[in-house]
């Protein structure tokens, strides 16, 4: 243990601060007041290596619509439930997306997040989660994702083992439960849009230096 043997371990520990979710600054933005909980937004780089699961969304039974936002989308088979909305800048996206959920899912399967991109969700803090929440949308995330426990605790969305679970979970949810989730998202979204995550860290650093 090099750090420990040289007495540097505690120094490094004191200098580490946990950011949590990334901020998503959108000054003056007001989220949509009405959302359709049977519509799901999928935003980001839609290349096949990262979002290969898109071709198999037809395996997910139910009356859901998937709205895609981002570059590199290649439609392999027509699916009336999948709608490509085009490519927008990060600043434009929150005003464009009106769906009821934002999906955080990577890999080539609807059954689990697979491959390098899917496995990375076990460790990283996906920026698209901040995008969705700042836009006013609850999120749907893989149950093994690093952010899944926090999403459950804060009641900011759904965590699933497989995308095939989504229709039943949404159908079981009452309108009151969904509205409560939207209220939770509203509060978190305000913090992300105002840059509260970074401000919290800078306040901690300043406090430690005093």
Sequence positions of predicted segments:
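A charged, aromatic-enriched C-terminal amphipathic alpha-helix characteristic of glycosyltransferases
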Residues: 161-164, 168, 175-210
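Single conserved hydrophobic/aromatic residue that forms the stacking wall/gate
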Residues: 1-12
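A short acidic/histidine/glycine-rich donor-binding loop in glycosyltransferase catalytic cores
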Residues: 154-160
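A short helix->loop->beta-strand "cap" motif at the edges of active sites that frequently abuts
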Residues: 13-14, 137
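Nucleotide-sugar-dependent
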Residues: 96-135, 141-149
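Conserved catalytic-core segment of nucleotide-activated headgroup transferases in glycan assembly
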Residues: 21-98
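Short, conserved active-site loop motifs that form the nucleotide-linked donor/cofactor pocket
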Residues: 16, 81-83, 157
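Hydrophobic/aromatic beta-strand patches that form the interior of the parallel beta-sheet core
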Residues: 17-19, 67, 103, 140, ...
């Amino acid at each position: 243990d090099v750090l420990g043997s040289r007495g540097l371990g505690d120094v490094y520990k004191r200098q580490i601060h946990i950011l949590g979710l990334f901020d998503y600054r959108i000054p003056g933005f007001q989220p949509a007041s009405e959302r359709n909980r049977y519509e799901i937004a999928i935003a980001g780089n839609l290349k096949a290596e990262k979002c290969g699961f898109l071709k198999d969304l037809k395996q997910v039974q139910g009356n859901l619509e998937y709205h895609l936002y981002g570059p590199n989308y290649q439609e392999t088979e027509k699916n009336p439930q999948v709608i490509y909305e085009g490519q927008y800048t990060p600043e434009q996206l929150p005003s464009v997306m009106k769906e009821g959920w934002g999906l955080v899912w990577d890999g080539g399967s609807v059954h689990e997040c697979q491959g390098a991109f899917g496995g990375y969700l076990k460790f990283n803090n996906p920026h698209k989660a901040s995008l969705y929440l700042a836009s006013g949308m609850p999120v749907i995330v893989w149950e093994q994702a690093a952010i899944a426990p926090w999403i459950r605790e804060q009641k900011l969305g759904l965590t699933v083992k497989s995308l095939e679970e989504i229709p039943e979970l949404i159908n079981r949810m009452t309108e009151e439960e969904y509205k409560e989730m939207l209220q939770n998202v509203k509060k978190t979204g305000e913090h992300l849009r105002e840059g509260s995550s970074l401000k919290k860290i800078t306040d901690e650093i300043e406090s430690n230096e005093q």
